[in-house]
Amino acid sequence: MRGISWDHPRGFGPLPPTAAQFAATHPDVQIVWEKRSLHDFGAYPVDELARKYDLVVLDHPWVGFMSETHCYLPMDELLPRAVLEDLAAHSVGPSHRSYEWDGHQWALAIDAATPVASYRPDLLARLGMHVPTTWQQVLELGRAARAAGMRIGMPLGPVDAISVFLTLADNIGGQPFATTGRVVSNDVARSVMDAMRRLAELCDPLDYTLTPITLMDRMSTTDQIVYCPLAYGYNNYSRAGFRPKLCLYADMPSLGNDGPKGSHIGGTGIAISTKCQWPQVAAEYCAWVCGGECQRTIYFDHGGQPGHSQAWDDPRVNQLSHDFFRNTRQTIERAYLRPRYNGYIRVQYEGGAMIQKCLRDNGDVDQLVRDLNDLYQQSLGGNK
């Protein structure tokens, strides 16, 4: 069988070793893994991947499209109910149910992630400051960092811009997409864009081009970036020796009064294409690689970021990752699950570009809301 994941040690590193271990007990099975870019992970049509690969690691907003195009096999038709119930019971936050749609489970949560805070403990100590828990404290840290010749940072490319926008909207009780035909109210949008603008003033213009990976690569190789309030977590950077400078993670800071609530859940799921000639064997591999024993051992040990709560609770896993999982658990358990209907991918990319442009150009927020609502309405027609 052929599988495809995405190009980062977190996304690809564990898969060849897990395939080799699975083959040791299934000598007639060989799984060859390939990788695609982070951008293609979110944007490349998953129906095209299904024509070429048996196993695909993908993003959960695709599940509505998957359901309508029938290019993947429902896991609930391949695995015993007890297996799926166990995985659901050991989900961190809404990771497992993010792959449910129209009465079926389209993928299993092989990886779990959500926007959280990251920081350099040595640089924070140099400033004599603590990890922020509120947005106001983030801004205070940003001003102190700038005065010391450093800065805070945050990836503000289109996909990350909409991630931050929806995270902060939900954090202040804005309930994105809860009202028919509306992304958020004008008042919520104004509050969120004001918070994002005040932060962007303390960041580098380069942040508009950064992804969570490129931002963390800068934080972990230079002494420029002290702290980032919101970006998808990568536990690799909090492991000794992964990069020259150790970075740590913490729960997201709150803009509202309800703590670390509303983070825009991400992570990845593993799915089986309809072209797979050995779906039962593929499902057995998927269930094993997403299960607690594999996730807290070989999967984590080869750079993965588990989606199973047994790994998140494991003392050894937390020790080796400087408590990445323990220190971000509250955020992921209270994460926001974005829409997943067929067509939402368009909102993610085009809407993200609208938010980024409004932020960068100090645009009119009420016009942004109108544009987002129009895009939302158009997207309900599905991916064309």
PLM region spans:
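Hinge/lid segment of periplasmic solute-binding proteins
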Residues: 63-114, 247-250
